[in-house]
Swiss-Prot record:
InterPro entries: Cyt_c_assmbl_TM_dom, Cytochrome_c-biogenesis_DsbD
Keywords annotated in UniProt: Chloroplast, Cytochrome c-type biogenesis, Membrane, Plastid, Transmembrane, Transmembrane helix
Name by which UniProt lists this protein: Putative cytochrome c-type biogenesis protein DbsD-like
Main function: Could be involved in cytochrome c synthesis.
Amino acid sequence: MKPDVLLYNSQHLINNITLYQLNHINIASFSFVFFSGLFTSFSPCLISILPICIMYISGEGQKLSQIDKLKNLFFFCLGAISSFTTLGLIATLLAKTYSQLFNGIPVISALVIIYMGFSLLNIVPLSTNNLNTRINNTNQNIKMYLSGVGIGLAISSCSTPIFVTLLIWVTSNHNLFIGLIFILIYSIGYIFPIIIGSLFSSRFLTTASSPFLNNLWAPFSGTILLSAGTFSLFSSILKY
């Protein structure tokens, strides 16, 4: 079985178990939502940008103290989690009026994944110069927070169908508070590899700096993203 097909089937299996846990809430449900986020993080989107995130948080080329690195990690993760919870809140509120909103999320996420794949393969440009200029002129904490928000918005496109299941559950049960707690726990699980990688950044940076990884990581990640995004796009279209 191809890796993208295996990943797709595994996500749907976890999605079904998550839905069962949401409909039979207990203490284990909260831990399972966390592990659902952790499992979903092993997707082409997050894996492809994981080295970039860790090097950015750790201040590659800068002599940052451990306290500064922890502060960077905190505000970066706060931004990423904020983007997830804000997306969840907006989608939930809009879904009360626009119930067809959720139907388009898998298609949009697939297109974002495909674009990220093309950008890693240098087929299409991913211009961030203007954004970087604006961010560099701000406070370091705000800079890390805004970077986390941007990364959170980008990688959230790879969190379907489990993230969509959470949103639909919140909407159908009209329990926004518990729903936001689930989304918060899920988002922490989703960015957990970034947290672990940043805490052990010294070892990671030594490995990531090898010429072999530098030359092969981008094309490998781009190919995986393009394959997974295309498969997800056609799967979503065929459902209509």
